[in-house]
Amino acid sequence: MTRARMYYDEDADLSVLDNKTIAIVGYGSQGHAHALNLKDSGIDVIVGLYEGSRSWARAENEGLAVYPTAEAAAKADLVMILLPDEVQREIYNRDIAPHLGTGKTLAFAHGFNIHFSQIVPSQEVDVLMVAPKGPGHLVRRVFTEGKGVPCLFAVEQDASGRARATAMAYARAIGGTRAGILETTFREEAETDLFGEQTVLCGGLTALIKAGFETLVEAGYQPELAYFECLHEVKLIVDLIVEGGLAKMRDSISNTAEFGDYTRGPRIVDERTKAEMKKILAEIQNGEFAKQWVLDSQANYASFKAMRRREAEHPIEEVGADLRKMMSWLRP
């Protein structure tokens, strides 16, 4: 197993961004964090939004110049697209691509649209990625505390010969090199990100939670207890894992729980599960998932909306809504 090399402040030259204007397209979770961190690092940063965006006034109130996306792209040397995957292609083709040319840089925080050829930039522009491994509010908060969130960075296209230095400088400007950044590729980031979401973090975890809840309720146990044991306490365990790995979690739980972990866990996630994971990974690698998602978005998200409605009606949601009213620490 080959370990990744980490890069820090001393490895990234912030002066690469001197006299450059960076346009942040989008002002959501990541957009506001990138823009404000860049601004605080002394970078000339502007924001590109559609006219009428609810974020327009917010960005201006936070001291940023805001322009319609096409105008921002025309003014910028580097355009960072921080929009949902499914809308990037349309906005890129309409508002950004006409203003890209020799010497300009196109940047992303996720490899999806480049790797799966939803966006195909001209050969004369640099294409890079800087992807913080944390939500925008965390990227912003720890930056203001003098720290940073680890980032991935990658170069897909290096027309200028300076794309890698630009990516590292950008990562430093948003605080990434304070914690450490590691180099990857658009392919590796896109495929591992989708795999993690589908098999573990989102798809795998929610399916496991629901199956556990349903098993207890079908066996006659009270749904409230099933909720506590199969959903509510997930956070307690995950927090321990994030803080110190699986070892800290196991050191913090009872011996009974740890013994059950070792003897029963592998019966739930076994070789059949791993075989299915490999199939899902193959569907990501060969573009099948990307094609399915793009086609559904083009059909006004018909399947996606139906699945969302169905999941919202699962009994665990009603039980959870009632129980969370009892938890004062969850209320603002």
UniProtKB/Swiss-Prot annotation:
Gene3D superfamilies on file: 6.10.240.10, NAD(P)-binding Rossmann-like Domain
SUPFAM superfamilies according to UniProt: 6-phosphogluconate dehydrogenase C-terminal domain-like (SSF48179), NAD(P)-binding Rossmann-fold domains (SSF51735)
Sequence positions that bind Mg(2+) 2: 193, 229, 233
This protein's pathway: Amino-acid biosynthesis; L-isoleucine biosynthesis; L-isoleucine from 2-oxobutanoate: step 2/4; Amino-acid biosynthesis; L-valine biosynthesis; L-valine from pyruvate: step 2/4
Catalyzed reactions per annotation: (2R)-2,3-dihydroxy-3-methylbutanoate + NADP(+) = (2S)-2-acetolactate + NADPH + H(+); (2R,3R)-2,3-dihydroxy-3-methylpentanoate + NADP(+) = (S)-2-ethyl-2-hydroxy-3-oxobutanoate + NADPH + H(+)
Gene Ontology terms: biological process: isoleucine biosynthetic process; L-valine biosynthetic process
The entry's keywords: Amino-acid biosynthesis, Branched-chain amino acid biosynthesis, Magnesium, Metal-binding, NADP, Oxidoreductase
Cofactor binding comment, as recorded: Binds 2 magnesium ions per subunit.
Binding sites annotated in the UniProt record for NADP(+): 27-30, 53, 55, 85-88, 136
Pfam families, alphabetized: KARI_C, KARI_N
GO molecular function: ketol-acid reductoisomerase activity; magnesium ion binding; NADP binding
Annotated ranges, domain KARI N-terminal Rossmann: 4-184
Designated name of the protein: Ketol-acid reductoisomerase (NADP(+))
Classification lineage: Bacteria, Bacillati, Cyanobacteriota, Cyanophyceae, Gloeobacterales
